[in-house]
């Protein structure tokens, strides 16, 4: 794993992630509160290796709120999770040095200012897509996915290459993303490296 300071990396990732999704963030609870406003949750706290006291404070804030998530990057206290319900277990923050790439055949990129969407179509249907945003010298990659019927064809890798092609053209030299267990294998094959583990929880539903 990389050994760069996690608070700074999280701030850099959040900056780009919020840009890709058109959402806002604010400092809160020794971390960040992002107003996600998605079907899955309304808001999400992000903490880096919190102390037991810091975690307990956030648990109290989300008590009874299944629509508010808590994501912890790095170490996690063993105590203090009783007020939370697990959402994900085995995700990672990942990072890479971006390199100039040729836009793969069949990949279309649609960009506006600091944002881009890469799309792969098969017979007129969207088979795979992904998006990215550039903030400073960072490119944050997000929502990389392939439709079930088109998996195992290398399309996600081409989407990543198309996004990298665009990001480098915008002056980015570092890539950041949050990877699921499934996605991590793809990113590792493309040269991405793990930075730190992350786990996500939600507040328990009221009884």
Segment roles from a protein language model:
Residues 76-85, 157, 169, 181-198, ...:
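Conserved active-site alpha-helix within GNAT-family acetyltransferase domains
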Residues 55-59, 146, 152-165, 169, ...:
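Conserved acetyl-CoA-binding loop-helix of GNAT-fold acetyltransferases
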Residues 141, 174-179:
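Conserved hydrophobic beta-strand within the GNAT/NAT acetyltransferase core sheet
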Residues 83-117, 122:
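Acyltransferase donor/substrate-recognition loop-hinge adjacent to the catalytic core
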């Amino acid at each position: 794993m990389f050994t760069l300071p996690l608070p700074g990396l999280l701030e850099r990732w959040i900056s780009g992630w919020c840009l890709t999704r058109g959402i806002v963030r604010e400092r809160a609870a020794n971390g960040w509160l992002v107003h996600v406003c998605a079907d899955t949750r309304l808001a999400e706290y992000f903490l880096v290796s919190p102390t037991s006291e810091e975690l307990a404070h956030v648990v109290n804030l989300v008590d009874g709120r299944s629509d508010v998530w808590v994501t912890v990057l790095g170490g996690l206290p063993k105590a203090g999770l009783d007020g939370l319900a697990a959402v994900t277990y085995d995700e990672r923050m990942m990072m890479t040095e971006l390199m100039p790439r040729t836009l793969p055949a069949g990949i279309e990129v649609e960009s506006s200012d600091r944002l881009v969407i890469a799309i792969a179509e098969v017979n007129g249907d969207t088979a795979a897509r992904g998006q990215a945003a550039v903030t400073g010298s960072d490119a944050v990659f997000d929502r990389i996915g392939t439709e079930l019927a088109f998996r195992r064809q290398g399309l996600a890798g081409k989407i990543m290459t198309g996004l990298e092609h665009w990001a480098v053209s915008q002056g980015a030299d570092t890539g950041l993303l949050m990877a699921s267990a499934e996605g991590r294998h793809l990113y590792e094959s493309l040269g991405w490296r793990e930075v730190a583990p992350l786990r996500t929880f939600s507040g328990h539903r009221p009884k």
